[in-house]
């Protein structure tokens, strides 16, 4: 709840919104949730690198106004799609020659509060905000050499919270159906494997389709 209050206060100060308009601001903020998988691979002579891998994702978003006292979920979007990308390497200070090449999978549950960006009225909409990702689970898949078993569970100490910026763009195809494009830009080292000498943050691009459910009487 504190995070919600801080985010609303930040938007209010940024856009110079008065107290009278504070209620309208709350109605405009969207609560977003998403499940996705990030990847990082150890490569020969390179500390870590991203792979061009696609993974399915699914999510749910609703405006805060839909969670009112009347309990009417009047604007809920169900989102399905896939994400492209994964971890972006950084802070690699030396070259390491790996005898075993491995791929790390980390599954995240992302949530975010987003605010609509000022665009002309039309079929195109855009929102942005901060997201928080909690690691659900992770595993190591050997690519070549070393391991006998196909997958190894990743230790919880390697599963770091993911925090970053979210940009979402929608294009309305119908009153209930929209095309979605999302960009997640991690700000922290959500993957930290100091034993092998590298850290990484999330960089994810996703596309998909959203369906709007509404129980509001026309």
Positions of PLM-derived features:
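Sec-dependent N-terminal signal peptides
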Residues: 4-13
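Short glycine/proline- and aromatic-enriched beta-strand/turn motifs that initiate or cap beta-hairpins
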Residues: 16-70, 212-218
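Residues that define the transmembrane beta-barrel architecture of outer-membrane proteins
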Residues: 23-29, 50-58, 103-109, 159-165, ...
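Transmembrane beta-strands of outer-membrane beta-barrel proteins
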Residues: 27-33, 74-80, 109-111, 124-130, ...
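Transmembrane beta-strands of outer-membrane beta-barrel pores
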Residues: 33-41, 64, 82-88, 105-108, ...
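Flexible, solvent-exposed loop segments that connect beta-strands
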Residues: 39-51, 84-106, 138-159, 190-200
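Outer-membrane beta-barrel architecture
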Residues: 59-65, 110-116, 168, 208-210
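Predominantly the C-terminal beta-signal and adjacent terminal strand-loop region
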Residues: 83, 154-218
């Amino acid at each position: 709840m504190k995070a919600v209050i801080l985010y609303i206060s930040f938007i209010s100060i940024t856009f110079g919104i008065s107290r009278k308009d504070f209620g309208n601001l709350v109605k405009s903020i969207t609560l977003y949730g998403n499940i996705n998988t990030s990847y990082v691979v150890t490569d020969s002579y390179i500390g870590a690198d991203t792979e061009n891998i696609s993974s399915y994702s699914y999510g749910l978003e609703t405006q805060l106004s839909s969670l009112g006292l009347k309990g009417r979920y009047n604007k809920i979007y169900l989102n399905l799609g896939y994400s492209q990308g994964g971890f972006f390497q950084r802070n690699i200070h030396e070259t390491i020659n790996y005898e075993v090449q491995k791929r790390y999978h980390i599954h995240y549950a992302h949530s975010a509060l987003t605010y609509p960006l000022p665009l002309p009225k039309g079929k195109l909409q855009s929102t942005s905000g901060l997201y928080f990702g909690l690691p659900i689970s992770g595993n190591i898949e050997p690519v070549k050499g070393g391991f006998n078993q196909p997958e190894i569970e990743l230790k919880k100490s390697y599963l770091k919270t993911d925090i970053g910026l979210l940009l979402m763009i929608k294009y309305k195809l119908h009153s209930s159906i929209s095309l979605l494009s999302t960009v997640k830009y991690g700000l922290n080292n959500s993957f930290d494997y100091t034993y092998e000498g590298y850290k990484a943050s999330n960089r994810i691009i996703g596309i998909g389709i959203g369906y709007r459910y509404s129980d509001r009487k026309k």
